[in-house]
Amino acid sequence: DGLETLIPNDKVDKYHEICRKWEIMTQLNLEHDEYSKLIIADVNNYMAVYKNGKTKCKGKFEWEELEKKKVSILHKNKSFLVVPKAVYAYFTKGVMPEDFLAQDNNIFNYCAGVKAKGGWVFEERSVKDSTLHVNKLQKIIRYFISNKGSKLVKCNKDGREIQTEAGQWLQTVINKVDPNKPFTEYDINKSYYLDEIYKQIQQIEKVSQRSSTQLSLF
C-alpha cells in the first residue's frame, strides 16, 4: 500500500531522513515516486502525472487500459470512453471538453453497453404519429445518445422498469457498426457527453478546493 504526501521544499531532506529511520526500524524498503500533478476524485479514482511525464489513471479514469482491452480489467465497463478521455485531456493537457469532442470521431468512444440478466429484457420505445411503438431487443445492446431516437427501457416480468438513461436523453441502438458510415451521420447528441464531462471535472475541482482549504488549517 502507499500514501501521498505534500512536502515543503525545505523539509524534503527531513522527510527522507525519517523514511530511512523507518526502514531501519522495520527492515522494510520504501519506494518513492514524485508527481508533478495529482488529480483526485476520491481514493479509488484519480489521475497522476509523474515528473518524468508518465501518467497513471485508476478507477473510472482508466480509459487507456480499457481502450487497449487489457485482460486485467475486462470486468470493467467501457461505456462512454469519451468522457474519461476528455477529463484526462482537460486536467493533463489543458484541452477544453468542447475542443476534445470536436476532434474525437471514433463512434465507439460514444457508445455504452448494457446487459439484461434473469427476468429482465430490453425494449426500445418511440412515438411516431402520436402512436407508441415498442420493439423487443436482445439481452446485450450497445447504444449512443442521439438527438433523435428512442427511449431504451429495461423491463422485468414483474412490472418493474428502468430507463437506461433517465430524463430527456434519447438513444440509438448500434449493435453493428458500418465501417463505411461517416461519423457526421450518427446524429450524436454532444450536449449529453459535455454534461457528463463537466460533472466529473466539477466534482474533482470541488475536491481539490476542499483539500486546499483543509491543508491551509495546518
Q: Where do the PLM segments sit?
A:
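Catalytic palm active-site di-aspartate
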Residues: 1-6
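C-terminal, non-catalytic extensions of nucleic-acid polymerases
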Residues: 12-218
